[in-house]
Structures are given as structure tokens and as C-alpha cells.
């Protein structure tokens, strides 16, 4: 059984028994939703997602490109890898630095090349 997490995206095809999975576990999502590229998947069940955004500089009346890196939980049913374009959603604190969870892989690294 797959839960409705409140976002209009397809649930993963695989099933997992991770309690911190928003689709198959008991984790609720709320708040902000971001899109970014996975730059690291070294820690177990964790990915580092880098997102780029524009920030307005009032003095120069121009925009600059900035980036931020966010640590997110990577459930086994989604299994995001380095180079994948993913959608992450805010949730309760899962650890000292993890407050987001990967809810979908929008594009695999092989498809982007």
C-alpha cells in the first residue's frame, strides 16, 4: 500500500520497509519542496542535494547565481545516485543535519547525458 503524501507525483515502483520513507513508512512531509542535483551519496541512506537559485543584489540592480547544499534522507525504494535530478521535501528533523527527504527522482543521471 502506498500513502498519499500530498504531492502530485508518481509513487516509486519498488516497495521498501523503511519507517522514514514518506511513501511506505510513517514520515509526514510539510513545508518547502525543492528540486536539485545529487552531488554525493556516500553516507548510508543519505544524499547531498545541491540547488541553485538567483539572489537579487540591490546595490548593483542585478542577480547573482547562488547555491546551497542540503542533506536529505534517501529511502531504499527511491535510491537516488550521484547526478540524478531529484525532488526533496521538508519534514521533521531526522538527524542533526537532515530535515529533508527525497520524494522522487525526476531524471536519472544516464538520461541527462
From Swiss-Prot:
Keyword flag rRNA-binding: yes
A GO term for molecular function: structural constituent of ribosome
Example GO BP: translation
PROSITE patterns according to UniProt: RIBOSOMAL_S17
Recorded family membership: Belongs to the universal ribosomal protein uS17 family.
Subunit composition and interactions: Part of the 30S ribosomal subunit.
Function summary: One of the primary rRNA binding proteins, it binds specifically to the 5'-end of 16S ribosomal RNA.
PANTHER family given in the database record: 40S RIBOSOMAL PROTEIN S11 FAMILY MEMBER, 40S RIBOSOMAL PROTEIN S11-RELATED
Protein name: Small ribosomal subunit protein uS17
Species assigned in the record: Pyrococcus abyssi (strain GE5 / Orsay)
Gene: rps17
